[in-house]
A protein has these predicted regions:
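Conserved catalytic core of the tyrosine transesterase superfamily
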Residues: 1-414
Length: 414
């Protein structure tokens, strides 16, 4: 697609040939006729509203937001245009991505000012090289640190000599209002990590600032780890009995979560070469501490993976074990897909109130190992906890062993 003439805005493109190029690209990425037609109708609707008498259309954030938030709410366009908000938003995001890929419109504007983006990159290098943060943790911390710096230094420049404890407290009072303790702790950990980075790399005096970061009222080991019992796990696994390629993939994914206690991003990162069929082991290369761990591969888990690879995995050049079965094809699944797999399985098996995401299956794996006689050290090795203190919480759900050491209630019968 060609950019329109110089009198138009930077996000303006010629309408001629746009729809044809758009649908052809979607077909090439594996989108089916129904999805392609729905997206095509949404883009046509946007063009008819945005540029009814022009040969160019502005594909910028402002007109897209007005179209979705204002026009679709009270649309009275003739015919049967695509009016679904979610479908329209997805269709226009795809259009922007396609046009940016061939330089028809400029790249998306950065989330933060340039000086903050540069600082975030320095922090990311430090976090990777020194701290060994998991990718998902680093992404979350970058977002919170970016918001922190944007609020603290709105005029540009990073002058920490001008920042005092009051500024820290005001940021948390505003940003974390109404947050649960766990969410506040995430923000606090991000800001604390960044200030320590400043002290190490730039010798900034941050002691008073660190002391001003609030401590969330969240006590370690205070709660019980939520897990599924054997009957609930059986119901969950029975929801994959349909001989559908995607269900076979999803079954293998959930077996990795239930049998090995893998995290969602670890399952997504598995590659074909990580499976040693001869020795029945699985190599996990993308853990939280950037270690390479070799885990035993249970027979039931290996069978589920082998069944998927031999019978259901689509032809692809990707070396990922688990790949997408819906457009965009020829790409590995990500943590979001795995969360969706678990939630859909929970809905099918009537466990919506009990199973909210993959991490509860990690708790279930640990609890099953404990009930099977494994020691806390063995569980810590499988879950790859760096400290036994992290694993100690599972001792609270071992009722058999707890009953053996329980003392009678004073003055009564236990």
């Amino acid at each position: 697609m060609s950019v329109s003439d110089s009198t138009a805005g930077p996000n303006s493109v010629k309408i001629s040939g746009l729809i044809e190029h758009y649908t052809k690209t979607l077909h090439g990425r594996g989108y089916g006729p129904l999805a392609t037609n729905a997206y095509k109708r949404a883009v046509e609707h946007f063009i008819a509203w945005s540029a009814p008498d022009s040969d160019c259309v502005e594909i910028g954030e402002a007109p897209i937001r007005r179209f979705i938030d204002e026009h679709l709410v009270d649309c009275s366009c003739a015919g049967r245009p695509q009016r679904g908000k979610v479908t329209t938003q997805s269709a226009l995001r795809h259009l922007q991505a396609i046009l940016r890929a061939n330089c028809s419109i400029p790249p998306a504007p950065p989330s933060f000012p340039v000086f903050i983006i540069s600082e975030l990159q320095d922090y990311s290098d430090f976090a990777n090289d020194v701290c060994g943060l998991a990718p998902a943790t680093l992404i979350s911390r970058r977002q919170w640190i970016g918001r922190f710096l944007t609020r603290i230094f709105p005029s540009g420049g990073l002058d920490f000599s001008q920042l005092g404890p009051k500024g820290i407290r005001e940021f948390f009072a505003t940003q974390c209002q109404g947050y649960q303790p766990g969410s506040t702790q995430v923000v606090a950990s991000s800001v604390r990590s960044y200030l320590r980075f400043r002290a190490l790399r730039h010798a900034d005096p941050v002691e008073a600032l660190l002391a001003a970061i609030p401590q969330a009222a969240r006590w370690r080991l205070a709660s019980l780890p939520e897990h599924l019992n054997q009957e609930e796990l059986a119901r969950l696994m029975s929801s994959f009995e349909q001989a559908d390629p995607q269900r076979q993939r999803d079954h293998a994914i959930v077996r990795c979560l239930v049998d090995l206690g893998l995290r969602s991003f670890e399952v997504a990162a598995l590659r074909l070469e990580d499976i040693d069929w001869k020795n029945a082991t699985l190599t996990v290369r993308v853990g939280k501490s950037h270690r390479v761990d070799i885990l035993p591969l249970p027979a039931v888990t290996g069978h589920a993976i082998a069944n998927y690879l031999h019978k259901a995995r689509p032809a692809t050049e990707s070396r990922a074990v688990f790949v997408r079965h819906r457009a965009p094809l020829d790409a590995p699944v990500d943590a979001g897909v795995i969360r969706s797999v678990v939630r859909q399985a929970a809905a099918r098996s009537g466990l919506v109130g009990r199973l909210h995401g993959p991490h509860r299956l990690r708790h279930s794996a640990a609890t099953r190992m404990l009930q099977g006689g494994a020691t806390l050290k063995e569980i810590a090795d499988v879950l790859r906890h760096r400290s036994l203190d992290t694993t100690a919480i599972y001792a609270k759900v071992d009722l058999t062993r707890l009953s053996a050491i329980a003392q009678p209630w004073p003055g009564g019968v236990s």
